[in-house]
Amino acid sequence: MIVVIDYGVGNIASVLNMLKRVGAKAKASDSREDIEQAEKLILPGVGAFDAGMQTLRKSGLVDVLTEQVMIKRKPVMGVCLGSQMLGLRSEEGAEPGLGWIDMDSVRFERRDDRKVPHMGWNQVSPQLEHPILSGINEQSRFYFVHSYYMVPKDPDDILLSCNYGQKFTAAVARDNVFGFQFHPEKSHKFGMQLFKNFVELV
């Protein structure tokens, strides 16, 4: 069973629909018991970093999530804002992140040659060989909507990069923790492949 963390933030219905399409048994829940019994976890999120972290903390789930991810080593996928929340902090606010990956999130600088937020389809470039990237290559396109991007302290944590007037991190991976800046649930066949890979991770 995959549990999509339901803390009131994120495209939960879209994520569940995509998981259903790849044949996964999944549910949205804010129950500690469900989280403890889950095989894998997905942390969705949209909006501002501080609001997301405050809402997650008010849900009372941070401790059980941290136990399941960092001690029990359950695979977790952070999506969009959820990926940034895996890190230490964001320039967007003052709230501390979950700290599961040593990284910050920083804002794209405004320039004449690009708009902020970065919105729309963009190609990604794999930086690591990993089972979660099976079938994903330089031709794979994903849907982005974001003004901030992840900056891991360790370059070996960069799973995918992307170019938007500069090279930036589109996805991170450390052990059982995965973060995707784009919206795989809105990325059609490429997003479906990514969810399929996550479901099949051992």
Swiss-Prot record:
Record's subcellular location: Cytoplasm
Gene Ontology BP, a term: L-histidine biosynthetic process
Catalytic residues (positions): C80, H183, E185
Pathway in which the depicted protein is active: Amino-acid biosynthesis; L-histidine biosynthesis; L-histidine from 5-phospho-alpha-D-ribose 1-diphosphate: step 5/9
Molecular function in Gene Ontology: glutaminase activity; imidazoleglycerol-phosphate synthase activity; lyase activity
InterPro entries to which the protein is assigned, alphabetical: Class_I_gatase-like, GATASE, Imidazole-glycPsynth_HisH
Keywords: Amino-acid biosynthesis, Cytoplasm, Glutamine amidotransferase, Histidine biosynthesis, Hydrolase, Lyase
Record-annotated Glutamine amidotransferase type-1 domain positions: 1-202
Entry GO terms, CC: cytoplasm
Catalytic activity annotation: 5-[(5-phospho-1-deoxy-D-ribulos-1-ylimino)methylamino]-1-(5-phospho-beta-D-ribosyl)imidazole-4-carboxamide + L-glutamine = D-erythro-1-(imidazol-4-yl)glycerol 3-phosphate + 5-amino-1-(5-phospho-beta-D-ribosyl)imidazole-4-carboxamide + L-glutamate + H(+); L-glutamine + H2O = L-glutamate + NH4(+)
EC identifiers of the protein: 4.3.2.10, 3.5.1.2
SUPFAM superfamilies: Class I glutamine amidotransferase-like
Lineage top rank: taxon: Bacteria
Function noted in UniProt: IGPS catalyzes the conversion of PRFAR and glutamine to IGP, AICAR and glutamate. The HisH subunit catalyzes the hydrolysis of glutamine to glutamate and ammonia as part of the synthesis of IGP and AICAR. The resulting ammonia molecule is channeled to the active site of HisF.
Subunit structure: Heterodimer of HisH and HisF.
PANTHER family noted in UniProt: IMIDAZOLE GLYCEROL PHOSPHATE SYNTHASE SUBUNIT HISH (PTHR42701:SF1)
Protein name (Swiss-Prot/TrEMBL): Imidazole glycerol phosphate synthase subunit HisH 2
Species the sequence originates in: Pseudomonas aeruginosa (strain ATCC 15692 / DSM 22644 / CIP 104116 / JCM 14847 / LMG 12228 / 1C / PRS 101 / PAO1)
Gene: hisH2
